[in-house]
Amino acid sequence: MRSRLISWAWGLLTPVLLAFLWEFFSRRSIAHAYAFVPVADIWRSFWELAGNGDLALNLWATLRSALLGLSIGTLLGISVGASMGIIKTADVLIGPIYHMVRQVPLLGWIPLIGLWFGTGVFSKNLIVAMAVFYPMALHTYEGIRNVEKPYLEVGEIFRFGRWQRFVHVLLPNAWPYIFTGFSNALAFAWVATVGSELLFATGPGLGALMLIAQSASRMDVVIVCIVTIGIIGCLMNFGIGKIRKWFLGWHCAH
């Protein structure tokens, strides 16, 4: 317990030091105060946004978009990855296209998506779904292809059909790979959601709020949004890490 508290204390040292340096530069001159907004002003803006509901409204919009894109990308990724891993014809037909397309940076699709679908909510959700789809499909494929031979022989002994073999043999043994892919996909979804809001500034969202604050020279609001995005991302990473640790322990036990 004591070692954990010491570890937490050391972990807080860097943020405190950065806050001290930030405050130091903000008080050097007016020019520095514009770029490095005093911590007191940032704190005041946080309570202002929290009090009038703007922070909650935009945060919920970003979380909702991330969750929708995560759900769609996960389902499609598992479906495509499983198809390539199980059906050789699907691997031959889909595999080359998938591996070629995933080499294109996500930002490279922005002009095409904007041209085809405009700059609305659908385009933002599509970007998030694409960011999630790639790691989910790859890890599902790798998980199914790396199932050990003894497990496959069990399916042959029981004369499982293709669906039974997938449900009772391949999928249970591929879950660690799939969960690792989901951990990565969750981080990608959050980053892609905020990025899409910055690129397609339509509707509420933390990214849109940052752009509005930037145009109004409200650097304090921009910093509040950045810190909020970082904290939510850390909480997601912490939560999925705990779930992954529990899940892998349960999976090994069963």
Label each region the model flagged:
Residues 99-135, 142-143:
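Generic hydrophobic transmembrane alpha-helix motif, especially the helices
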Residues 88, 145, 176, 180-183, ...:
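C-terminal transmembrane helix and the adjacent membrane-cytosol boundary/short C-terminal tail
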Residues 1-26:
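N-terminal signal-anchor/first transmembrane alpha helix
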Residues 115-116, 192-228, 254:
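Glycine-rich helix-loop "coupling/hinge" segments at transmembrane-helix boundaries
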Residues 28-71:
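Periplasmic/extracellular loop-to-transmembrane helix junction in inner-membrane transport proteins
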Residues 139, 143-178:
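Short cytoplasmic-facing helical segments at TM-TM junctions of multi-pass membrane proteins
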